[in-house]
C-alpha cells in the first residue's frame, strides 16, 4: 500500500492556507472560530 501522507507544500497551502480559507464563506467561519478560540496559528 502507498503511504497516505505525501507531503506537498503547494497542495498544503492551496487547500488549508489563509487565502483558501478566505475564499469561501465556510472558510471564513473556520477562521472566525479559531480567532474566538484564541488559536496562535489560524492556518498552516
Curated annotation (Swiss-Prot):
The biological processes this protein is annotated with in GO are: translation
Name it. Answer: Large ribosomal subunit protein bL34
From which source organism is this entry? Answer: Exiguobacterium sibiricum (strain DSM 17290 / CCUG 55495 / CIP 109462 / JCM 13490 / 255-15)
Q: Does the keyword Ribonucleoprotein apply?
A: yes
The GO molecular function terms of this record are: structural constituent of ribosome
Q: Which NCBIfam families does the record cross-reference, listed alphabetically? A: rpmH_bact
GO annotations of cellular component type? ribonucleoprotein complex; ribosome
Membership in a protein family: Belongs to the bacterial ribosomal protein bL34 family.
Q: Which UniProt keywords apply?
A: Ribonucleoprotein, Ribosomal protein
| A Pfam family that the UniProt record links to this protein | Ribosomal_L34
Amino acid at each position: 500500500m502507498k503511504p497516505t501522507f505525501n507531503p506537498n507544500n503547494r497542495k498544503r497551502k492551496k487547500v488549508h492556507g489563509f487565502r483558501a480559507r478566505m475564499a469561501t464563506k465556510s472558510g471564513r467561519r473556520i477562521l472566525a472560530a479559531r480567532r474566538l478560540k484564541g488559536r496562535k496559528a489560524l492556518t498552516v
